[in-house]
């Protein structure tokens, strides 16, 4: 099992699909990595030599922000918005939708389960 960017890559899958298991690499970047390194996209991970895995690892380290660094960067961006006191930061702080979605109905994923309101019982 190959280990790239701290993630165990599944061995039975094709290389571009296996690379998408790394946080921060989608299908577009996976195809870009495979073509840049010069590996056939139809090859499986268990068919790669150690040198080819090393090439992939070096390309990712040099050109992409992935896994923990990407998560940390995202968290720092959200924290910066909250510290600035911007509208988006306030929405993050309150746990509400950030991008202008309606909240009168819906937004249950962001707001959490519905809280019952005490009313008269029939």
Curated annotation (Swiss-Prot):
HAMAP family: Ribosomal_uS13 (MF_01315). GO terms for cellular component: cytosol; small ribosomal subunit. Residues 92-122 are annotated as: Disordered. InterPro entries: Rbsml_uS13_C, Ribosomal_uS13, Ribosomal_uS13-like_H2TH, Ribosomal_uS13_bac-type, Ribosomal_uS13_CS. Pfam families: Ribosomal_S13 (PF00416). Coiled coil: none annotated. Located at the top of the head of the 30S subunit, it contacts several helices of the 16S rRNA. In the 70S ribosome it contacts the 23S rRNA (bridge B1a) and protein L5 of the 50S subunit (bridge B1b), connecting the 2 subunits; these bridges are implicated in subunit movement. Contacts the tRNAs in the A and P-sites. GO terms for biological process: translation. It comes from the Bacteria. Part of the 30S ribosomal subunit. Forms a loose heterodimer with protein S19. Forms two bridges to the 50S subunit in the 70S ribosome. The keyword Ribosomal protein applies. Keywords: Ribonucleoprotein, Ribosomal protein, RNA-binding, rRNA-binding, tRNA-binding. It comes from Paracoccus denitrificans (strain Pd 1222). One of its GO terms (molecular function) is structural constituent of ribosome. Belongs to the universal ribosomal protein uS13 family. This is Small ribosomal subunit protein uS13. PANTHER family: 30S RIBOSOMAL PROTEIN S13/40S RIBOSOMAL PROTEIN S18 (PTHR10871), SMALL RIBOSOMAL SUBUNIT PROTEIN US13M (PTHR10871:SF1).
């Amino acid at each position: 099992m190959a280990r790239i960017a701290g993630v165990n890559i599944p061995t039975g899958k094709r290389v571009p699909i296996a690379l998408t298991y790394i946080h921060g690499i989608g299908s577009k970047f996976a195809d870009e990595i495979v073509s840049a390194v010069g590996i056939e996209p139809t090859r499986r991970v268990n068919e790669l030599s150690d040198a080819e895995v090393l090439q992939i690892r070096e390309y990712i380290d040099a050109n992409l922000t992935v896994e923990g660094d990407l998560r940390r960067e995202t968290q720092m961006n959200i924290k910066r918005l909250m510290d600035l006191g911007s509208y988006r930061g306030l929405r993050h702080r309150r746990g509400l939708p950030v991008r202008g979605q309606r909240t009168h109905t819906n937004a249950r994923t962001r707001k959490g389960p519905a809280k019952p309101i005490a009313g008269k019982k029939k």
